[in-house]
Swiss-Prot record:
Enzymatic reactions: N(6)-[(R)-lipoyl]-L-lysyl-[glycine-cleavage complex H protein] + glycine + H(+) = N(6)-[(R)-S(8)-aminomethyldihydrolipoyl]-L-lysyl-[glycine-cleavage complex H protein] + CO2
Cofactor section: pyridoxal 5'-phosphate
Name used for this protein in its record: Glycine dehydrogenase (decarboxylating)
Positions of modified residues (N6-(pyridoxal phosphate)lysine): 723
């Protein structure tokens, strides 16, 4: 309900309470244009109402007849009401002290990092740093992450994060398959690897023909494997000397992957020093809450020879136009949006925000602080080992860092019972053994309580911690010869910012370098950079969500699972499908899971041979990359001159592959920003030839409430909660990529049997390390839907379409809109064709993107899906004022181009070719350009009161790839 201004109500009869309640207030804050602005934009487009515009844009044949069936969430909640409802769910969770371990540990997030990174929109609303000149802050933070990982693992180079430890291990397996022993298809996994890691590896290996063998680590050299995975320390706590084994594996022609605990590596000899080829792991215990499984930043580090085969993103150092150091994403030609099915991985979203948190944890503590934490954890474990031995229990492992396995025999059930009474979780290793893993939050009081549990089970008295500390000096823990002697984190960044004042200023200096949604609109097509409301973000830091172990007993996670069930039903309503799994922790993983589900469906019908996946030429690069990972053969379907799927070519390809057609992958609205009129026909053709229809949900922001893939012929889709449903992009992650399916596919949704999560017996294997993936950020989407309600979610979609058409209409006289539907209308994004400009002026799409930085904008998506174009997506959250500011910038840039075309500006010495302009360049004593300093820095008047300065000039991408350097830059280079 839209309230009148209070001044107009002063002299009237008092309104009822119902009329004054503001349940819709959040929607008015989320949707940028108010009613007057919307009408003004509609007038520009020639429509009387938003409904009339939508009728003209979306084919009537696929329009949703009913309002979103959100059940109890159909009516919007106020921000306070939604927070209270979610708090009630959170309070149903029980926060126990968890010593379960198995790759997840409680941790202290330094308050300065919590407030100034995790809770700071300058960090969490940024996009992936594809435009390096306006991303130097987060690129530096990610470079710190890479340096931290490389130092601690002892390997040459690390990437800028992966999704979780299990998927990182699977990526390492496929990396070694591409580069290793050609005669073998065997990957050997030691039997003390984390069980969730083994399950994800099995899932990944099956469709691409890799045979996974498991057994004792000692037998690995005889396995004739192209790669071997070792855990260091092992899941049960053992710290083993793998030097001789690694040599033997290499001698047999294999390579070694080590899943290593980074905190342990501050005191243990790193894998790179004893011959490992690849190291993977999780950085969660570096200040990132457990969060019921995620999100956390995994890492993958390699020897130098594998650097060009690494999956994921990689930050490298180059120089800018002035020869100064500049950071950028390196080796981007490896990535799926360029190489498609030949990419090194399908990973797109990773875990940038969490990687930044982990790197800042290392910056804040420094090498001495990290080692002190590690030694304290190890000492607590040693005291516990001494204490339980005094109580008559035997430890299974004599060597350990933080984890002990205790032989509890017939008293095992009692130990768990007594622990539960003290609100303590222990790992259930077996019917006769208990696992205990310590972390930085463990205190001497915690240790005393834990010893009391075992004393109660033993019928004895617990030894005091002080007595143990005085008498346990000689307790063995780390194996002789494996103590770390090499230095790490020697770069100045890890040795300077240890006071909170210094840390606060360092974080501020980095965030000031970047352009995120807190400064301006980010009109990236296919990315949906909408509002990430503060009220949606608040629950992420609640301990009732953050301090829950992913493998905690079910009775402790009632609130979490209830919230997850509700969110799944919300997404079922939005998509028109029958069931949803939230396990995939990125869109790429949801896509991959969906294809595995399709394969499982065909196999259940005796048609496992169906392996051809039709993909339109316009598709996002993750589509063919995911199809390849799922063991499918990619067949490209042509698009017509209007950017639509060529129906004749589709029919021909479907007929040609009728016997082995598995699926088609389409994006809707299309990647060209248009609602294709014949989408139902596309689905029918594929179904008629035995295939399933995969509808990529990347553009779901144009469909919610208006149409639904599950209703116009889709069988499976993935969604991007970090696009449509308001999880922030975090500078390149986290994300959530739920997979939604029709009723006939529901029984194939992913399980995680290794941790006791079995959704359906026929379900595919795990695709993420935790049963619910990145569970701790799911409250963001829950809050968004709860506060919007059915009517306002639909209004948001309509406004996104309105905003896109307004931009297209206003810019069409200056830049051709490449594709449009009937009436010249677009969906929620539009493609501006800059190719004619290149012909007439020599100005490239890259030049325009860089020049937009001088105007205070992040560029739209460049050269996707068509080279030489810009794809613009404004979302519903941007006001008309911000849209007009962007339009004015684009028109002004067009006039600058016209000056080149008409000879009034030089083809090389003009403000576009030299963009972006830094403050240092503009204020330098010498100004060598024909255009003025004012035109360079202040091309429009509005910049006089609100100016963003790019911190570096144009980055030299070619130089950076030729001279690959992916470690922290010495201070002297900035002189």
């Amino acid at each position: 309900m839209k309230l009148e201004h209070p001044d107009r109500l002063m002299n009237r009869t008092p309104l009822s309470l119902a009329a004054l309640e503001t349940h819709d207030a959040f929607a008015e804050r989320h949707i940028g244009p108010d009613a007057a602005s919307q009408q003004a934009m509609l007038d520009t487009l020639g429509f009387a109402s938003r409904a009339a515009l939508i009728d003209a844009v979306i084919p009537a044949s696929i329009r949703r007849a009913e309002t979103l069936p959100l059940g109890p969430f159909a009516q919007p909640k106020s921000e306070a009401e939604a927070l209270a409802a979610l708090r009630a769910l959170a309070d149903k969770n029980q926060v126990f002290r968890s010593y379960i371990g198995q790759g997840y540990h409680d941790t202290h997030t330094p308050a300065v990092i919590l407030r100034n990174v995790l809770e700071n929109p300058a960090w969490y609303t940024a996009y992936t740093p594809y435009q390096p000149e306006i991303s130097q802050g987060r690129l530096e933070a990610l470079l710190n992450f890479q340096q931290m990982v490389a130092d601690l693992t002892g390997l040459a180079i690390s990437n800028a994060s992966l999704l979780d430890e299990a998927t990182a291990a699977a990526e390492a397996m496929t990396l070694l398959q591409r580069t290793g022993k050609p005669a073998s298809n065997v990957f050997y996994v030691a039997d003390d690897v984390l069980p969730q890691t083994l399950e994800v590896i099995r899932t990944r290996a099956l469709p691409i023909g890799i045979e996974v063998k498991t057994g004792p680590a000692a037998d690995a050299a005889q396995a004739n494997a192209f790669g071997v995975l070792l855990q260091y320390p092992g899941v049960n706590g053992d710290v083993r000397d793998y030097r001789a084994l690694t040599e033997a594996i290499h001698a047999a022609g294999g390579h070694v992957v080590v899943a290593a605990d980074l905190l342990a590596l501050t005191v243990l000899t790193p894998p790179g020093e004893w011959g490992a080829d690849v190291a993977v792991g999780n950085t969660q215990r570096f200040g990132v809450p457990m969060g019921f499984g995620g999100p956390h930043a995994a890492y993958l580090a390699v020897r130098d020879e594998f650097k060009r085969q690494m999956p994921g993103r990689l930050v490298g150092v180059t120089v800018d136009a002035q020869g100064k150091p500049a950071l950028r994403l390196a080796l981007q030609t490896r990535e799926q949006h360029i190489r498609r099915e030949k990419a090194t991985s399908n990973v797109c979203t990773a875990q940038a925000l969490l990687a930044i948190m982990a790197s800042m944890y290392a910056v804040y503590h420094g090498p001495h602080g990290l080692k002190t934490i590690a030694l304290r954890v190890n000492r607590i474990a040693a005291l516990f080992a001494a204490g339980v031995k005094q109580l008559g229990f035997a430890t299974v492992n004599d060597t350990f860092f933080d984890t002990l396995t205790i032989d509890t025999g017939a008293r095992t059930a009692q130990v768990h019972e007594f622990a539960k009474a003290r609100r303590i979780n222990l790992r259930r290793v077996s019917a006769t053994q208990v696992g205990v893993s310590f972390d930085e939050t463990t205190t001497r009081d915690d240790l005393a309580a834990l010893l009391a549990v075992f004393a109660q089970a033993a019928g004895g008295t617990a030894p005091s911690v002080d007595a143990l500390d005085a008498g346990a000096a000689g307790v063995a823990a780390l194996p002789a010869g494996l103590e770390r002697t090499s230095a790490y984190l020697t770069h100045h960044v890890f040795n300077r910012h240890h006071s909170e004042t210094e840390m606060l200023r360092y974080l501020r200096s980095l965030s000031d370098k970047d352009l995120a949604l807190d400064r301006s609109m980010i009109p990236l097509g296919s990315c949906t950079m909408k509002l990430n409301a503060t009220s949606e973000m608040l629950p992420v830091t609640w301990p009732e969500f953050g301090r829950i172990h992913p493998f905690a007993p079910a009775e402790q996670t009632v609130g979490y699972r209830e919230m997850i069930d509700q969110l799944e039903q919300m997404l079922v309503a939005a998509t028109g499908y029958a069931a949803v799994s939230l396990q995939p922790n990125a869109g790429s993983q949801g896509e991959y899971a969906g294809l595995l589900i399709i394969h499982a469906y065909h196999a259940s019908r005796g048609e496992a041979h169906r392996d051809v996946c039709l993909i339109p030429a316009s598709a996002h690069g993750t589509n063919p990359a995911s199809a390849h990972m799922a063991g499918m053969k990619v067949v490209v379907v042509a698009c017509d001159a209007q950017g639509n799927v060529d129906i004749a070519d589709l029919k021909a390809k479907a007929e040609q592959h009728a016997n082995d057609l598995a699926a088609i992958m389409i994006t809707y609205p299309s990647t060209h920003g248009v609602f294709e009129q014949n989408v139902r026909e596309i689905c029918e053709i594929v179904h008629a030839h035995g295939g399933q229809v995969y509808v990529d949900g990347a553009n779901m922001n144009a469909m919610v409430g208006l149409t639904a893939p599950g209703q116009f012929g889709g069988d499976v889709s993935h969604l991007n909660l970090h696009k449509t449903f308001c999880i922030p992009h975090g500078g390149g992650g986290p994300g959530v990529g739920p997979v939604a399916v029709g009723a006939h596919l529901a029984k194939f949704l992913p399980n995680q049997r290794s941790t006791g999560y079995t959704r359906e017996e026929d379900g595919i294997g795990a695709v993420s390390a935790a049963p619910y993936g990145s569970a701790s950020i799911l409250p963001i989407s829950w809050m968004y839907i709860a506060m919007m309600g059915a009517k306002n979610l639909t209004a948001a979609t309509e406004t996104a379409i309105l905003n896109a058409n307004y931009i297209a209409k206003r810019l069409a006289p200056h830049y051709p809109v490449l594709y449009s539907g009937p009436g010249g209308l677009v969906a929620h994004e539009c493609i501006l064709d800059l190719r004619p400009i290149k012909e007439t002026s020599g100005i490239s799409v890259d030049d325009v993107a860089k020049r937009l930085m001088d105007y205070g904008f992040h560029a739209p998506t460049m050269s996707f899906p068509v080279p030489g174009t810009l794809m613009v997506e404004p979302t519903e959250s941007e006001s008309q004022e911000e849209l007009d500011r962007f339009i004015a910038a684009m028109i002004a840039i067009r006039e600058e181009i016209r000056a080149v075309e008409e000879g009034r500006a030089d083809r090389e010495d003009n403000p576009l070719r030299h963009a972006p302009h830094t403050a240092a360049v503009v204020t330098a004593n010498e100004w060598p350009h024909a255009y003025s300093r004012e035109q360079a820095a202040y091309p429009v008047a509005s910049l006089g009161t609100n100016k963003y300065w790019p911190p570096v000039g144009r980055a030299d991408n070619a130089y950076g790839d030729r001279n690959l350097f992916c470690s922290c830059v010495p201070m002297s280079d900035y002189a």
